[in-house]
Amino acid sequence: MNKIILHAQDLDGFLTEGDKKNIESVHALYEKSLDACRRIDNDNSDCKAKDDLSASAAEIGDKLKEICSTNDRIHVYSFETPREQHGEASRIIAKLRNPETGHEEFLYYIQRAYELMFAHSFADKNLNNKRAMIQMTPVTNPCRNYAVHKIPDVDELAHSSVMCVMLRGALLPSMIISKEFQDYSSDDTITPFALFKIKRDESKKESNMDYVLDLDRSFFKLEELDGKDLIFADPMNATGGSLVTIVKYLKEHGVKPRSIKFINVISALKGALRITRVIEEAEVYTLWMDPVLNEQAYILPGLGDAGDRLNGEDKGPEPRNMIQLIADYGSNIVNLYRDQVIEIEKTVLN
């Protein structure tokens, strides 16, 4: 088997002493939240526990904002957008966290999350550089009508970007970002895809975690990534290890990216800090920041296993292949992202 392995110990050496102190301080604050969670779980009518949880969440939010303000390559949606927009982001995250949110509804809110994140990561940065889109309408009386819409011009970035997919949880989010580029571009650009089969060793704990890149089940060409804007869209950034493993491999084989963006729905503080310390050209964009990881390296409070909730669990002894994963999204998703599906199929077959 042709595999590349990165150890967690290789990542922590890049954290500064200030980073480590900040991570420890947030852990200490989150202990108050855990205490309130235990009391609520024991008695759901405990109003004092709920008030304590709300107060703890506010304290943690202020601390995370303070920490992120010192790192200009970590972008948290609710820390950088007007207050009026925070309610929508909070509602989306709450629905995704809810264990009662079913598969189709979970897909819907992931789509909403990545539409917001595309606007924040790309479109909003081009508000001063707009183009006119002339759109035909169905109205023909007294003549065929056309409407003018000014939209951010993202053509240059659309043409230079490659969607780098960390299978399997990042498959649909990457398709969503690609379609946003297509819809914003003046020439219907379909971004190319590079597919990386990577997973954590779930038998390990956060402190000694291994990240395994399976090259035999990955589909990419190094020369097509060199000098490009590499975009990774993964719902969850817990430790940052998977992204770092891939980028280190690419750089060791001569790839020099123009830029790297990691776009998440939820990022843990430690994962965001690690990425920006290890990869000098990387920027992390996240809709929400959660404070800590548990010893299994899962984000707290988190939303569970995003890969399983997006794709369903593998039932057989072998994991599903790319085409099976896409088919399991259902016809509505496949039809909506048909151009992206075709591009992914080309990547796999070639």
Residue ranges and their predicted role:
Residues 1-350:
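PRPP-associated nucleotide enzymes
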